[in-house]
Amino acid sequence: MKRLSVLCSLLLVAAALGTELPLATPCDEEACKLPDCRCSSTNIPGGLRARDTPQFVTVTFDDGINVINIETYREVLYGRSNSNRCPAGATFYVSHEYTNYQLVNELYNRGFEIALHSISHRTPQAFWADATYQNLVQEIGDQKRQMAHFASIPASAIKGVRIPFLQMSGNTSFQVMADFDLLYDCTWPTTALTNPGLWPYTLHHESIQDCIIPPCPTASIPGPWVLPMISWRDLNNFPCSMVDGCFFTPDRTDEEGWFKFILTNFERHYLGNRAPFGFFVHEWFISSNPAIKRAFVRFMDIINNLNDVFMVNSAEVIDWVKNPVPIDRYRQQQCKFTMPSICRPSFCGPLTGTHNQLSYYMTICNTCPRNYPWVGNPLGQ
Ligand SMILES: *[C@@H]1O[C@H](CO)[C@@H](O)[C@H](O)[C@H]1NC(C)=O
């Protein structure tokens, strides 16, 4: 099994090295049509009017899932529904180290989306900028299998990627995504295309998106979608990709100020071209700032009661863009269904990390591995 996967990786590398990727050419709307191709643009998919377009809100959290941060997720997310009575979504970009996979299984069974954020989340950031195809096969491609195995969830449910530090390596992560059947990337910030906002698109053709953290892809790579991280604006109009990265903000104890700050950013989308509105944040920022947590909860309480706003898993946004329907038809659709997936937990450890000789403990939904799973040995065999 391991030898087979090594062989597969080698074949993929050979395929990647053997052919230089074609440079993307300017997008031709006539040649690039939904559901599988979309030019990068701020046009609303399907030519809908803004008032007929569902305003999607994507709440996302990054990094490991553990017994501490799950408390916040349970408190602020569980039991929420949108106005169409479908459960509200959120997406977790999970890194492997110190993740408790029993809790990943719990989030999955609650209908939330589990996505990839690398096995190691290693520093320095330059590692990701310079990452080779093989590096990213081991960090992202292999993580899909690892996540499915330890959290006992279907590999087909794992669709999204966010690279650590929002640091892309040009074409490479998208090539890996195409080869490992991953649907979309949510790593690429835009500060230029925020009002009106950039809608998700594919990389068949040249992207019009500004490259904030180079290198960005320039090849034609059919397959994966880009779900742009549309920046917020702070109180001095400086852009920020992650909410916890905004600089000039209301005081962290000012609930009312934060509530208005969130709404102001939301309204740029809601009263504009309704490009998906992202609330991209780390759990520590919410749990260590109770006033911001209350403001965030108030914001969700409001949007969960608006008839044209839907807090969804990020992959659901891509599903809608591929097949855009107006709000009234969207509201009639059935809610997404998650087939329950049982976790029989094993508490494993101490397991030695063969890369650093540290002892690790893991809670997983499978039999315990021999070694601590890591880059190059994702199942810890
Ligand atoms: C991406 O691929 C294009 C086309 O082959 C190439 O010109 C470009 O240099 C590549 N980008 C990086 C960062 O390697």
Curated annotation (Swiss-Prot):
Glycans are attached at residue 171. Disulfide bonds join 27-39, 32-37, 86-335, 211-216, 240-246, 343-365, 348-368. It catalyses: [(1->4)-N-acetyl-beta-D-glucosaminyl](n) + n H2O = chitosan + n acetate. Keywords: Carbohydrate metabolism, Chitin degradation, Disulfide bond, Glycoprotein, Hydrolase, Metal-binding, Polysaccharide degradation, Secreted, Signal, Zinc. Zn(2+) binds at residues 63, 117, 121. GO terms for biological process: chitin catabolic process; polysaccharide catabolic process. GO terms for molecular function: chitin deacetylase activity; zinc ion binding. This is Chitin deacetylase 8. It comes from Bombyx mori. The lineage of its organism: Eukaryota, Metazoa, Ecdysozoa, Arthropoda, Hexapoda.
